[in-house]
Amino acid sequence: MAAAGGAALWRRLAAWLPRGPPGLAALLGRLSDRLSRGRDRRSRRSSWLLLAPLLTPPVPVITAMPCSLCPEGAHRFQWIRNLVPEFGISSSHVKVLSSPAEFYELLKVQIKTAKQRVVMASLYLGTGLLEQELVNCLEETLEKSLQANESPNLRVSILLDYTRGSRGRKNSRTMLIPLLQRFPEQVRVSLFHTPNLRGLLKLLIPERFNETIGLQHIKVYLFDDNVILSGANLSDLYFTNRQDRYVLLQDSPEIADFFTELVDAIGDVSLQLQQDDTVQMMEGMVHPYQGDKVRYCEIANQRVMEVIDSARTRQELLHAKTFHSSQQGSSMLPQHDSEASEGLKPEPDTWIYPLIQMKPFGIQIDEMVTETLLTEAERDAKIYLTTGYFNLTQAYMDLILGTRAEYRILLASPEVNGFFGAKGVAGAIPSAYVYIEHQFYNEVCCLHQQERVQLQEYSRAGWTFHAKGLWLYLAGSSLPCLTLIGSPNFGYRSVHRDLEAQVAIVTENKALQQQLHQEQEQLYLCSGVVSSSTFEQPSRHVKLWVKLVTPLIKNFF
């Protein structure tokens, strides 16, 4: 029965590749034949078979979210609140940052002034002097809290990826152990390990490449009631010359509570770093790679969805009498009445929607919302979409090519790709991205869509590029009313493998729209439009082996 089920799965996967590489389809077909013949497992212990389930994305089950968009204004996006909590705030609480240095200085200031909580989620913490300075700031703030109170209030929770945070002799873990040893009651360090990296696969894949199977990729930096959403990691490059995006949400306790609970939920299903550099799971928790995978993913899904659903319920109740009075459609209170009534805050002009994507746990909210935004974008609307690694899912590519809005897609030129100049196989990764970019550009040209869909490459001497997200300009508007900002980069890994989180910021405030517009312009100013001549440059030559391998490995990056 197991062999028959496996064969059926492989045949479905192979059938799902109408436009995929024939070599991959053939590989899946051969694997299905081998499964159906029921050969002894020992004769099939090849690394290719172990990797086979990862060579193609799972059969997609998501369709565009049905929605009824309001005809005018930012409120047309209120359908998102059917999926996630909606946080209404004043635009004066939102600040868009522009540079790595500004991001780094803000992190230090926020750590030093934190009184109640510091919550940081990142892929990893670097090991250089700048990162050590951050750790020192944490230590000083914890020490002050300890001296000020017999029962100190400050709690520090750090969530990192296990594989990336454990790489090398000096790593994220060794950077943080002194904090655990000095403040064991106040500091928690959680290391997420993907449930997909287990068994022989875990033994066979080298340390440098095991992160390709799946990661904790969320980047949230939270201090009391202030929240920074970004795509930047806690590493010196992201503090100096690696361009990313960053937004600060100030004095936003409800949003801070949500992301605290989200990080806690992921932390609860993660390995806990101990003072002696060992790790262990919380008592009673299923192990991510030694325990039952299905049960582990079920528990993780329940924990995360509890956070989302409870926050959504709280927000509906909290704002019932201000700007969404009831599900029956009763009118909202006038602003002067709501301000006068029991000291309520004025009606918000900006709405924050947290979008979570954790495909290993069956959570695909960000994917649903992104696909719906692309689907519903009207004719003459403009979408500026940026990604440091251009490897869009087939669904996103089809929507871009098949819908009506204008697209300006910003991506990294090979020279500002984070893998440019890397040793070994990793050094060929920029060429793989060039190959993917060229294929997409050819599709655009074949459909005669060059005017509607334009690619632009970011290029800046001495810098690398890691910005991701989008800005949506409604038809006839010169300013964006919506942006997506956070960790997802619209690629296969982001959608299918990693844990991701971003926010949709919807605003009616012209000053905030101007901030977002200036952010977009500043990034795009460092770019040039891609044309057919771009791929004729010597630096864009892609070796044959890269062209052959890229279709097989594109689901890993």
Curated annotation (Swiss-Prot):
Compartment(s) where it occurs, according to its Swiss-Prot or TrEMBL record: Mitochondrion
GO biological process, one term: cardiolipin biosynthetic process
Coiled coil: none
Superkingdom of origin: Eukaryota
Regulation acting on activity, per entry: Activated by calcium and magnesium and inhibited by other bivalent cations.
Annotated spans, Disordered: 322-346
Record's compositionally biased regions (Polar residues): 323-333
Keyword Transmembrane helix: no
Catalytic activity field: a CDP-1,2-diacyl-sn-glycerol + sn-glycerol 3-phosphate = a 1,2-diacyl-sn-glycero-3-phospho-(1'-sn-glycero-3'-phosphate) + CMP + H(+)
GO terms under cellular component: mitochondrion
Name of the protein in its database record: CDP-diacylglycerol--glycerol-3-phosphate 3-phosphatidyltransferase, mitochondrial
Source organism (scientific name): Gallus gallus
Name of the gene: PGS1
